[in-house]
């Protein structure tokens, strides 16, 4: 099973105006939430461990995961659902988040550990859940607990600079995790923000490789494709062509989910360190195709297994 932790929220997307008032559509979201949904649609076992609110937004979040074949392993709680105000220009989203006192932050280490059953092969974490507060510390501690039980760990920082009140502390946390995890994916924007002392992308990549111990390290570059690390070199893979771009919401999450699905289906999770370059390129092709199909639909709407055959 792929176990997923991290935020769930409602994306509030302005769809028009009425009587001088903005009209918004509420769409389920959150980077790890999107990843769980994307993986569940691709025919592997997925469990989502983050609490979900009992409010109407939470009902929609829960129903959306269940319809995508994701098991809800976290509790339903009375606190409200987190919100993200989304502005989309030329298909590219920007966000403002409201997460104080919300359901997805009410994690406890004891309840998380209860989900580390023999079914779990890999745990994925990332994005807002690691930004600040006691919940960020709990997630970091849970990574250690998972690794102690032989569970592989995957990280996608998916950095949101506007939400990070203490950048230095956040960078330290992410870099600590980078030294531990088995699978790491980050975007070129994540890379330059996290390694802000580097003068360019190449020096940032060198600094990254100097601290990671992951067997799978991927850098995504949007329409330029992606890079993967293999025996002391970076290798390029092109982006998969997008038929007609709707927007890029959830593209990175779909890509990361597809990486984990491919590794799971091809029984590579136990042999990450010896995967050959050709297989790694096949992995990137599969993930890029899934992300491309998501970009052809409005919002995060990842492809189903039959669409990727």
Describe the role of every protein-language-model region.
Residues 3, 144, 198-309:
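Conserved phosphate-binding/catalytic region of the ribokinase-like
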Residues 1-68:
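Glycine-rich phosphate/adenosyl-contacting loop at the front of the ribokinase-like
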Residues 128-207, 224-225:
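Conserved beta-alpha-beta core of the PfkB/ribokinase-like small-molecule kinase fold
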Residues 115-116, 176-177, 210:
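Structural alpha-helical scaffold elements that stabilize or flank donor/cofactor-binding regions
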Residues 37, 83-87, 225-229:
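Short beta-strand scaffold segments in enzyme catalytic cores
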Residues 119-120, 181, 214:
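Short, well-ordered alpha-helix to beta-strand connector turns
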Residues 39, 187, 252:
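Short, conserved phosphate/pyrophosphate- and ester-handling motifs at nucleotide-, phospho-/glycolipid
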Residues 45-127:
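Conserved N-terminal subdomain of the carbohydrate kinase-like
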């Amino acid at each position: 099973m792929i176990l997923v932790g991290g935020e769930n929220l409602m994306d509030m997307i302005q769809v028009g105006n009425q009587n001088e008032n903005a009209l918004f559509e509420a769409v389920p979201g959150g980077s790890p939430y999107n990843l769980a949904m994307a993986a569940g649609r691709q025919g592997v076992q997925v469990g989502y461990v983050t609490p979900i609110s009992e409010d109407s937004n939470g009902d929609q979040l829960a129903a959306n995961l269940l319809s995508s074949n994701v098991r809800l392993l976290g509790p339903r709680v009375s606190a409200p659902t987190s919100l993200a105000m989304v502005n989309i220009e030329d298909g590219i989203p920007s966000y403002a988040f409201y997460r104080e006192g919300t359901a997805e932050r009410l994690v406890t280490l004891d309840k998380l550990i209860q989900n580390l059953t023999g079914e779990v092969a890999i745990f994925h974490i990332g994005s807002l859940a690691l930004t600040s507060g006691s919940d960020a510390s709990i997630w970091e501690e849970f990574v250690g607990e998972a690794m102690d039980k032989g569970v592989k760990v995957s990280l996608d920082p998916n950095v949101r600079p506007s939400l990070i009140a203490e950048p230095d502390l956040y960078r330290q946390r992410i870099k600590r995790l980078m030294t531990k995890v088995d699978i790491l994916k980050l975007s070129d924007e994540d890379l330059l923000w996290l390694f802000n002392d580097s003068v360019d992308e190449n020096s940032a990549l060198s600094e990254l490789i100097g601290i990671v111990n992951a067997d799978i390290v991927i850098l995504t570059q949007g329409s330029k494709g992606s890079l993967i690390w293999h025996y002391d070199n970076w290798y390029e893979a092109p982006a998969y062509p997008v038929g007609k771009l709707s927007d890029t919401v959830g593209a990175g999450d779909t890509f990361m989910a597809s990486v984990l699905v491919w590794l799971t289906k091809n029984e590579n999770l136990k042999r990450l360190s010896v995967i050959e370059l050709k297989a790694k390129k096949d992995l990137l092709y599969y993930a890029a195709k899934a992300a491309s199909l998501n970009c052809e639909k409005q919002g995060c709407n990842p492809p189903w297994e039959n669409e990727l055959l």
